C-alpha cells in the first residue's frame, strides 16, 4: 500500500515508497469527522476543525509526492439536511481554511478548483472560494479540487436541464446529443 513518511527521517527497516506508483488523481470523501469527535466526547464541529487541519497536511504531502489532482468531497448536497448549527459551521470552514492556507497553496504551486453549485452557498463562503481560485489561478502544479454543494444526481439533473433548455431554444438537435454533450 501507499503510505506517507518523512523523507529525511526514514527508518532503515521501512520499505521505500515506489514513486512510479503514485496515482495521478486521488479523491477523498471527507466523512466521519463528526463521529470521530463524538467518539472522543467532543462536539461534532471539533471533528470538522480537526479534519481541516488534516486536509492541510494531506494537501502538502500529496503535492510533494507528485499527485496531479487531489479531489476532496467536502460538502455534498445531502449535507444541507444536517442540523443548522453544523451546516453554519461547515459554511465557515472554507473561509477559515482559505484565509489561512492560500499562501501555502501558492508557495507549493497548488491550484484550487471547485465542482458543485457554489451559488447556493452563503455569499461570504462563495467569496472565499472564488478568492482562493483567483489567488491560485496561475499555479500550475497540483490541482486541489473541492466538491462543494456537490451531488452526482444534482450534477446529472443540472446537465439534463441545460441540454433541455438548449433543445427547447432550437440551439441543439436532440438527435445529436452524445456523451460529450453531457
Where are these regions (language model features)?
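Flexible, compositionally biased loop and terminal segments
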Residues: 1-182
